[in-house]
Structure formats: structure tokens, C-alpha cells
Amino acid sequence: MHRIRLFAGSAALALVAAIPAQAAVPKVTGTVGPGFTIGVKKLAFKPGKTTLTVADKSGIHNFHLIGPGVNVKTSIVGSGTKTFNITLKRGLYRFLCDPHASVMKGSFRVS
């Protein structure tokens, strides 16, 4: 009886171990504010589905991401966190604050 339980438990454990773990969705993290600052944590990414999470720490700026097939932005009014589901394609992506684009801008590459 103990051997049957041990075998069944071992078989269940082997089955669970054989199921491949789902790969985590890569994340792009952007910030805007405080003051006249804007940025992303990394500057190089691989193509594919991802989430863009923006921490807006100012009520006078927005975070606008533009690139191949992507054009998303947060609101200028208010602050907080906003998340977008996007698909990155190979190429150059620019991020900026629309009202202050001459001084608040940057870019990253997807390759």
C-alpha cells in the first residue's frame, strides 16, 4: 500500500516537473518627473510582447512612446502609474514629454 502511494506521488511530481514554466513577459519601465526628468530603466530590448509601466511623478508631464507599431502616451494632467500592453518590433523607439520635448526625451533600441 505504501509503495502504491509513493509511486502515485512520484508520478504526479514528475508530471508537474515536465510542464514547462511559462516565460515571464519582459517589462519596460518608464518614469517621468519629478522635475524635468524622463527615462527608462534599460535601453536595449528584444522584439516581442511586453508591458510598459510608466510611473508618472509629476502633474505637468506625460510619457509618450513612439516606435515601429507603437504610439502610446500617458495623460499630462495628474500623476500615478499606467500600464500598456505593447509589441516591440526591431528598430528605434523614442520616448518624450510632449509639452517639453526639447529637453525631456530619450530613446532605446529593439534588436
Each language-model region and where it sits:
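Surface-exposed loop/edge segments in extracytoplasmic proteins
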Residues: 69-75
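Short loop/turn segments at connectors of secondary-structure elements within structured domains
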Residues: 24, 46, 57-61, 102-104
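Beta-strand signatures of extracellular beta-sandwich domains
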Residues: 62-66
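Beta-strand cores of secreted/periplasmic/IMS beta-sandwich domains, seen most often
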Residues: 41-59, 83-96
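Bacterial Sec-dependent signal peptides at the C-terminal "C-region" and cleavage site
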Residues: 18-24
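Bacterial N-terminal signal peptides
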Residues: 9-18
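Positively charged n-region of N-terminal signal peptides that target proteins for export
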Residues: 1-6
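Extracellular/periplasmic metallocenter environments
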Residues: 24-37, 77-111
